[in-house]
């Protein structure tokens, strides 16, 4: 699944490709992807001009002035721009024809991606309803708030970080990296973390997601950015996907286990389980 660094990289690519372009026609082949009114989606988008492309957590925000098209890539979603003819592909599901003759295509092998066309004034309420946490930046991701939320919860720390309420944008790859960097076992109850561990989790979340953005995201399966290029963050992953390899910190073999139903990579020496 594209996580915050991948979605931010897609955002930057889209802004380069389609900023200022007018949508002249929309073709939708998988109606279930649209979570707001279908007729409004089909009739309102033509004539809209793409004023900016933003992001909140793992959501892309295509700013159309008074309206915002909120796009979530889910597991396999990606955007491609074709300057002329669009080739046949059974995984191409949404087509945005632009005034300059190009077509922005949404591709999704799993068909899990979603679109919500909402008034810009409703955007805050949209994310509040989903209990989306702050962006992982020092200005918005406050240590004291993070600490209070953790200490009041019995949830294991990995599922808690994944649920998007503590901080927006973490997924399975970057959670494993953050937990390893902070020397925290993923099954530890949030309330049992000490202040030093919580500070490390906070600081490493900010650092690692920023590094992921700098490296253009991780291409570990099918991820490509909007320009069709791979990311390079996979070359900097310390624990995710490294089963059997020596821990970069202590040399112990990395192991893979299940936590909260998710495949999880840890160093059993650096990330000791609490008795």
From Swiss-Prot:
Keywords: DNA damage, DNA repair, DNA-binding, Glycosidase, Hydrolase, Lyase, Metal-binding, Multifunctional enzyme, Zinc, Zinc-finger. It catalyses: Hydrolysis of DNA containing ring-opened 7-methylguanine residues, releasing 2,6-diamino-4-hydroxy-5-(N-methyl)formamidopyrimidine; 2'-deoxyribonucleotide-(2'-deoxyribose 5'-phosphate)-2'-deoxyribonucleotide-DNA = a 3'-end 2'-deoxyribonucleotide-(2,3-dehydro-2,3-deoxyribose 5'-phosphate)-DNA + a 5'-end 5'-phospho-2'-deoxyribonucleoside-DNA + H(+). GO terms for molecular function: 8-oxo-7,8-dihydroguanine DNA N-glycosylase activity; class I DNA-(apurinic or apyrimidinic site) endonuclease activity; damaged DNA binding; zinc ion binding. Binds 1 zinc ion per subunit. Its EC number is 3.2.2.23, 4.2.99.18. One of its GO terms (biological process) is base-excision repair. InterPro entries: DNA_glyclase/AP_lyase_DNA-bd (IPR015886), DNA_glyclase_Znf_dom_DNA_BS (IPR015887), Formamido-pyr_DNA_Glyclase (IPR020629), FPG_cat (IPR012319), MutM-like_N-ter (IPR035937), Ribosomal_uS13-like_H2TH (IPR010979), Znf_DNA_glyclase/AP_lyase (IPR000214), Znf_FPG/IleRS (IPR010663). It comes from the Bacteria. SMART domains: Fapy_DNA_glyco, H2TH. Involved in base excision repair of DNA damaged by oxidation or by mutagenic agents. Acts as a DNA glycosylase that recognizes and removes damaged bases. Has a preference for oxidized purines, such as 7,8-dihydro-8-oxoguanine (8-oxoG). Has AP (apurinic/apyrimidinic) lyase activity and introduces nicks in the DNA strand. Cleaves the DNA backbone by beta-delta elimination to generate a single-strand break at the site of the removed base with both 3'- and 5'-phosphates. Belongs to the FPG family. This is Formamidopyrimidine-DNA glycosylase. It comes from Streptococcus pyogenes serotype M28 (strain MGAS6180). The gene is mutM.
């Amino acid at each position: 699944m594209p996580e915050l660094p991948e979605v931010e990289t897609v955002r930057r690519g889209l802004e380069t490709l389609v900023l200022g372009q007018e949508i002249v026609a929309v073709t939708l082949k998988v109606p279930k992807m649209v979570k707001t009114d279908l007729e409004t989606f089909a009739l309102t988008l033509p004539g809209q001009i793409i004023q900016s492309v933003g992001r909140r957590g793992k959501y892309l925000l295509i700013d159309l002035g008074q309206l915002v098209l909120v796009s979530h890539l889910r597991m396999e979603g990606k955007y491609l721009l074709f300057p002329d003819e669009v080739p046949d592909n059974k995984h191409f599901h949404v087509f945005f024809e632009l005034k300059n003759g190009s077509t922005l295509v949404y591709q999704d092998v799993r068909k899990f991606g979603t679109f919500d066309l909402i008034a810009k004034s409703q955007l805050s309420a949209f994310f509040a309803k989903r209990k989306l946490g702050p962006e992982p930046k020092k200005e918005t991701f406050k240590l004291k708030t993070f600490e209070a939320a953790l200490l009041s919860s019995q949830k294991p720390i990995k599922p808690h970080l994944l649920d998007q309420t503590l901080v927006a944008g973490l997924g399975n790859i970057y959670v494993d990296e953050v937990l390893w960097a902070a020397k925290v076992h993923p099954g530890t109850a949030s309330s049992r973390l000490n202040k030093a561990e919580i500070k490390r989790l906070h600081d490493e979340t900010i650092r690692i997601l920023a590094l992921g953005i700098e490296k253009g995201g991780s291409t570990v399966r099918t991820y490509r950015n909007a320009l069709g290029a791979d990311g390079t963050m996979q070359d900097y992953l310390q624990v995710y996907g490294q089963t059997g390899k020596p821990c970069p910190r202590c040399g112990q073999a990395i192991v893979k286990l299940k936590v909260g139903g998710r495949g999880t990579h840890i160093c059993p020496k650096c990330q000791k389980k609490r008795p």
